[in-house]
């Protein structure tokens, strides 16, 4: 039997049931199919079935969905005793967040006649929002209870929708791949939460805050899925035609260049020239993050490769040198290193987007300017001002993420959430039935000490 403080027998079912009942009521009251999903509305107009947006967007949605549930979930399985928590809580948070995001994003973007209209594009956007929450999850991985994670998701999804509305609807910011709205927001929100939840005695669990051979292999499954599908992620909601094609291509080459930079930097920063699997699992993905904002712009293939190359270098240096400083000096215990994979590359992507937007001309974009920068095309703003809007959007995103993360962190610090003790962080058996657990004498795959077993069974 687990410790009374971490026992989820009543807390988790009550929380899950109440949240889902509320969601069902809200969906029943506010949500309905959009015209491309509704049987009556679709057949009231003259068109062919293959013109339905489903056939254009669903392949991208499938890829994004795999990234959310398989990619993010398995990327975090590197911890030797927290594989269930990584994949399992990722599953739980994502299932809740996509429903709550549908409501929050619909409230700001999709209200028609007092109803939220949903279709395949709203599914993609909900997954994007969920991705931001899962990024924040990476910062607090192994140190929080499922109740805390669900509570964090409630607040973060809401703030994500507010930030997204300000940037995309009010300011006219371009951020199709979410360098700002998804990665920067999720990273700095999560970093502030984990700062407030700082554990001065986390060293008591440091023997579990590491990987073993097979756990790193599982994490590489997540890396490979994310790497393969990132072009779909960045291009999923861009305009059909050349915009979507260009975004996928730019992401494709950015990731490739980033990967070579990652391998090179990993060897350089190691005193014996050996590769660090932490770098390969994470930094090789930074190119997808960094090209998210500018991916749909005329960045050019070599430009996207430069961005990816820079992102790989920055990310590896962050893992090697910056993460220890953040923990020692700023007391930011970032379990997955989200600052290095999502935070700094996200900021880089926002800067690249601002510069690329400021340099946009009709000679380069022609009539395509209307798709990429509609406000510039219709004369509402010039390219320089669009670049300024992009830069302002980064500042707004950072402000909302930092302030929101600090506030939510204090909420999560309340003693009602059943957090694991310092001695049992990064340990599945606190919240999960773990079959076939090995004793320390039987092998090195387990790091549970005898006194910790007594604590769990008390």
UniProtKB/Swiss-Prot annotation:
GO CC, any one term: apicolateral plasma membrane
Membrane side Extracellular: residue ranges: 33-58, 105-121, 173-176, 238-247, 296-298, 362-391
Subcellular compartments: Apicolateral cell membrane; Cytoplasmic vesicle membrane
Listed transmembrane segments: 12-32, 59-79, 84-104, 122-142, 152-172, 177-197, 217-237, 248-270, 275-295, 299-319, 341-361, 392-412
UniProt KW Glycoprotein keyword: yes
Topology versus the membrane: Multi-pass membrane protein
Alphabetized UniProt keyword annotations: Ammonia transport, Cell membrane, Cytoplasmic vesicle, Glycoprotein, Membrane, Transmembrane, Transmembrane helix, Transport
Superkingdom, natural source: Eukaryota
Presence of the UniProt keyword Calcium in the record: no
Biological process annotations from GO: ammonium homeostasis
Region called Disordered, residue ranges: 436-458
InterPro entries in the record: Ammonium/urea_transptr, NH4_transpt_AmtB-like_dom, RhesusRHD
Residues exposed to the Cytoplasmic side: 1-11, 80-83, 143-151, 198-216, 271-274, 320-340, 413-458
Main location: membrane
Glycan-linked positions: 44
General function of this protein: Functions as an ammonia transporter. May play a role in the elimination of ammonia in the gill.
Family: Belongs to the ammonium transporter (TC 2.A.49) family. Rh subfamily.
PANTHER family: AMMONIUM TRANSPORTER, AMMONIUM TRANSPORTER RH TYPE B
Protein name according to UniProt: Ammonium transporter Rh type B
Gene: rhbg
